[in-house]
């Protein structure tokens, strides 16, 4: 398999492990084959009511994907298509899933929390 083909079937997703606000994300780096599921996890700061998921690409810059208030999704208008989903089952945990992953999903993904 040529390097161009390998590049096209690989997907690189980067997340910030710790932000200045003290939010914890995992995994720090994710490389997957095209078509696989990617799950990103976020632990907001204790006591914060709002959680935000963002995506940053070189071409489009920073984009808000979705945000929650007290575990309830408020605005998900930035979520691309049906392949992306986000949940916040409790105040201390959220996930962002991409399935199936595509090369155009390569980006830096991160979450933030706020009072």
From Swiss-Prot:
- Pfam families tied to this protein: V-set
Q: Which UniProt keywords apply?
A: Adaptive immunity, Cell membrane, Disulfide bond, Glycoprotein, Immunity, Immunoglobulin domain, Membrane, Receptor, Signal, T cell receptor
Kindly report the protein's main subcellular placement as a broad class: membrane
Does Hydrolase show up as a keyword for this record?
Answer: no
Q: Which InterPro entries match?
A: Ig-like_dom, Ig-like_dom_sf, Ig-like_fold, Ig_V-set, TCR_beta_variable
Which cell locations does it reside in?
Cell membrane
GO CC entries: plasma membrane; T cell receptor complex
The SS bond pairs are 42-111
GO BP term, example: cell surface receptor signaling pathway
The answer to whether UniProt assigns keyword Repeat to this entry is no
Tell me the ranges covered by the Ig-like domain, including all copies: 22-115
* Signal peptide (residue range): 1-21
Give the source's domain of life in one word.
Answer: Eukaryota
Q: Which residues are glycosylated?
A: 90
> What does the UniProt function comment say about this protein?
V region of the variable domain of T cell receptor (TR) beta chain that participates in the antigen recognition. Alpha-beta T cell receptors are antigen specific receptors which are essential to the immune response and are present on the cell surface of T lymphocytes. Recognize peptide-major histocompatibility (MH) (pMH) complexes that are displayed by antigen presenting cells (APC), a prerequisite for efficient T cell adaptive immunity against pathogens.
**Quaternary structure, from the entry:** Alpha-beta TR is a heterodimer composed of an alpha and beta chain; disulfide-linked. The alpha-beta TR is associated with the transmembrane signaling CD3 coreceptor proteins to form the TR-CD3 (TcR or TCR). The assembly of alpha-beta TR heterodimers with CD3 occurs in the endoplasmic reticulum where a single alpha-beta TR heterodimer associates with one CD3D-CD3E heterodimer, one CD3G-CD3E heterodimer and one CD247 homodimer forming a stable octameric structure. CD3D-CD3E and CD3G-CD3E heterodimers preferentially associate with TR alpha and TR beta chains, respectively.
Q: What is this protein called?
A: T cell receptor beta variable 12-4
